[in-house]
């Protein structure tokens, strides 16, 4: 049944590819990857394997800079704000002549900035991101959960208290999850995605802490769904014209940290047909275009899959798709340059791991008694894809090893007690911007 809760994204899907490719030949077009961590590295490899030139724009040391598939690296001081991102893209366009290339954001705040400035950016780049009306439904979890409720998509019990007095309306004794409506307003201050409270007294204390960090009205309280990684699932897709042209369903068996993971560390493709219909219903309602991941958790109390999060960009383990038969970044590129894209769906039973976070997380879980060593070792058998290591492109994995001390401070790979001092930072000093183009300069597109 057609949903009536549609949000107009401002995109005419019948003309999107033609509009995006006007005035350019596909062979002259490359990809601009915004963020060069393992997620961005996967995008670069996806495009580079097909001979597509790649430029990485980043504000920190990252593994993609060492990839043989990256022709150009643009280092800037900051990418977190809308102004800094637009400035970085302008520098990339003017100094490297990469106009009309396809943009690949890897961070939520960059997706929001591209959506807010989409029309202005279309004259210089291909922007495979819908307008802000659609993106806000994914970026702001208040909008995500309200829309899901209108569409009868299961979600955890959720409350939106504006003040501490509103906690009286929370008719549950816990345990609770306290999270921000907009992740970036909380994550960069705390290094975590959410906090847990087991009692109502803890809930009040944690709410006060969260309310002191995020803007008024941005604190969300949810019931904590029981169960570990075996209950974490996701539906991933390239969505176009109201349909999933490509899709992949996964179980996110392990994540870092184990309680409220910032990123998955061990993922396998599975066949769970129940996730497709609610996901497609949600994406149709917001008029979505592009790559997308919808995170769910199966509630063992009632067997329902409940929507937790929507990520309107490539996700950390997107390279699992290529091993399972779906090369998501390349499919998006083909669509952006007007090439045909055939419907494809990932095969089940394919596994992905990121050793840099999975191993230390497993050690902590083994010490805590929540994971048995034998079970962990058996899970490593038959892994098909590692997030960074590749025989065809080995340098990034060497670079990652060298970066581990930096990542331990920057990305929170250290135990929590060692990360408590937020003043402890490891920074690599930069000029305002640095451009490295020692391999092959970006091709200049001719109109």
Please give the residue ranges for each predicted region.
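A short, GP-enriched loop/loop-strand-helix hinge that lies immediately N-terminal to
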Residues: 53, 74-75, 95-139, 154-157
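Peripheral (often C-terminal) accessory segments that flank ATP-dependent C-N-forming ligase machineries
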Residues: 13, 19-20, 334-447
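Short, glycine/polar-rich helix-capping loops at beta-to-alpha or helix-loop-helix junctions
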Residues: 56-70
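Glycine-rich adenosine-cofactor-binding loop
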Residues: 32-45
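Glycine-rich phosphate/pyrophosphate-binding beta-alpha loops
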Residues: 253-257, 262-264, 311-326
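Active-site nucleotide/adenylate-binding loops and adjacent lid/helix of ATP-dependent enzymes
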Residues: 135-220, 241-243, 273, 277
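Conserved metal-phosphate-binding beta-hairpin within the catalytic cores
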Residues: 283-319
